[in-house]
């Protein structure tokens, strides 16, 4: 992931934890044309159609191969970065619509609460301090 003044490598997480949120960067996924045509993105889901596609694919047992190689570099600042709370809520709706549980509901709720606190703190801190902590936290 390319940030303004540093880069970060991200490894694929545990696919069984997809209910917690994306376990990989969608730009790094290669999908067979046939599978993609048979399983289109939900264009009504404006914020997390990619997450919805991968969530349903993983939960339905689609064949997935993990490569231990970097195959994509992308710049931060997409919708899931700039509209983080909305993206988190949208992901939660995807999970809850198919697999509701109180535990998962509170898990997502606590993640969104933490994100709200971060947004409030970032509002008051100078950009240099925010950037400093991002470098420490994301490396």
Predicted feature locations:
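Short, structured coil/loop segments at alpha-helix boundaries
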Residues: 1, 42, 46, 68-69, ...
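Membrane-proximal basic amphipathic "stem/tether" segments
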Residues: 97-139
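Conserved nucleotide-sugar donor-binding catalytic segment
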Residues: 3-90
């Amino acid at each position: 992931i390319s940030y303004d003044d540093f880069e970060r490598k991200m490894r694929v997480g545990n696919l069984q934890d997809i209910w917690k949120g994306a376990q990989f960067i969608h730009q790094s996924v290669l999908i067979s044309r046939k599978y993609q045509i048979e399983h289109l993105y939900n264009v009504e889901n404006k914020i997390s159609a990619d997450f919805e596609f991968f969530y349903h694919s993983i939960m339905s047992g689609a064949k997935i191969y993990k490569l231990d190689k970097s195959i994509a570099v992308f710049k931060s600042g997409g919708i899931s970065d700039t509209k983080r709370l909305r993206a988190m809520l949208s992901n939660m709706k995807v999970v809850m619509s198919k697999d509701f549980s109180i535990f998962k509901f509170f898990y997502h709720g606590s993640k969104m609460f933490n994100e709200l606190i971060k947004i409030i703190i970032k509002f008051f801190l100078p950009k240099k301090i925010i950037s400093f902590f991002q470098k420490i936290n994301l490396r």
